[in-house]
A protein has these predicted regions:
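Short, cationic-aromatic polyanion-contact patches
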Residues: 64-72
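Short loop/turn and capping residues at structural boundaries
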Residues: 22, 39, 64-65
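The alpha-helix within a helix-turn-helix
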Residues: 25
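Short beta-strand "wing" residues that participate in macromolecule-binding interfaces
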Residues: 61
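Positively charged, polyanion-binding regions of nucleic-acid-associated proteins
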Residues: 1-22, 47-51
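Short, positively charged loop/turn segments that connect secondary-structure elements
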Residues: 19, 29-49, 54-58
Length: 72
């Protein structure tokens, strides 16, 4: 799964809960949404994906490293 899609899915499942990027990464890996053996620099990709999603307005950035699914 694409890292952006994985981040959106994890944040969507969290509902109104604000998650740190490390929690998003952990949940994506635990749910096997991202394969760390076939994806290079998983950590960097998740951080960059979350930043890009926030810039696109698809997720809300709540603070340094904190993200939440966009309401509505």
């Amino acid at each position: 799964m694409d890292p952006k899609e994985a981040c959106l899915l994890v944040l969507g499942e969290a509902g109104d809960e604000t998650l740190h990027w490390t929690v998003v990464l952990d949940r994506a890996l635990t749910q096997r949404l991202i394969d760390p053996f076939t994806t290079r620099d998983v950590r960097g990709l998740v951080v960059k994906s979350l930043a890009a999603l926030a810039k696109e307005g698809r997720v809300d950035k709540q603070g340094t490293g904190l993200y939440r699914a966009r309401a509505g």
